[in-house]
């Protein structure tokens, strides 16, 4: 408890100057973002750290799709990065963007990355390696491809995090990938979570033809289709 009180006291001291920003953050949280979680223990009224991530999907005139990702990290108090550069409250520590251009098969045809804000001067060099993801498929082996092509010091931790989760908005953008295309196979999102469990009520209600579907049956059907 002492540690928590000390932390709150320190927060009040170092957050003295950007009070207006903190007030805006609290107001936004209270008025625009009601919290459905149960009440927490006593804590600072404004968050210490905020990370906002947004994904957007667009249909292109050439038949492709663009999926864009944006990441912003902010503090509600002034900080010094590595004891040198001062970053005021509300100014992003990280502000990064990615655009993927994909086809109907979820294959990456183009990728662009940019860093508006970053902690070190040479961080943007990590965007060059992003081109290695061209030709990779979001639908299969996506996380492995990211680890193989952008892992460790080759890439950027935050760009990798954005890429990891671009698969879901990509599927939501290319809507026909969720439908039944007459192949006899279930849509790709079935069997991937509790809500769409083949043995659950969701599939029984909305996809009764795939109720109690077995993955091995799916594999056998794929092999038969390929051979034909």
Positions of the model-derived regions?
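Short, positively charged and aromatic/hydrophobic N-terminal segments
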Residues: 13, 20-25, 29-33
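N-terminal intrinsically disordered, cationic/polar leader segments
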Residues: 38-66, 72-81
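Active-site- and interface-proximal helix/loop "cap" or "latch" segments in soluble metabolic
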Residues: 37-38, 71, 75-228
């Amino acid at each position: 408890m002492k540690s928590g009180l000390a932390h709150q006291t320190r927060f009040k001291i170092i957050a003295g100057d950007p009070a207006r920003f903190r007030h805006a953050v609290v107001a936004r949280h209270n008025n625009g973002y009601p919290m459905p979680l149960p009440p927490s223990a006593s804590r600072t009224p404004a968050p210490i750290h905020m990370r906002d991530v947004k994904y957007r999907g667009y249909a292109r005139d050439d038949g492709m799709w663009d999926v864009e990702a944006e990441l912003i990290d902010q503090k509600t108090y002034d900080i010094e990065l590595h004891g040198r550069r001062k970053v005021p409250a509300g100014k992003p520590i990280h502000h990064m963007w990615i655009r993927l251009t994909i086809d109907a098969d979820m294959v990456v045809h183009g990728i662009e990355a940019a860093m508006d804000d970053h902690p070190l001067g040479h961080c943007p060099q990590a965007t060059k390696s992003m081109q290695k993801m061209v030709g990779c498929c979001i639908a299969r082996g996506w996380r492995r491809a990211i680890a193989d092509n952008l892992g460790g010091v080759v890439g950027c931790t935050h760009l990798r995090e954005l890429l990891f989760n671009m698969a879901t908005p990509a599927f939501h953008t290319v809507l026909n990938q969720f439908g039944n295309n007459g192949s006899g196979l279930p849509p790709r999102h079935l069997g991937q979570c509790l809500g769409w469990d083949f043995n659950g009520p969701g599939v029984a209600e909305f996809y009764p033809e795939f109720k109690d579907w077995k993955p091995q049956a799916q594999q056998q059907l794929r092999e038969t289709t390929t051979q034909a």
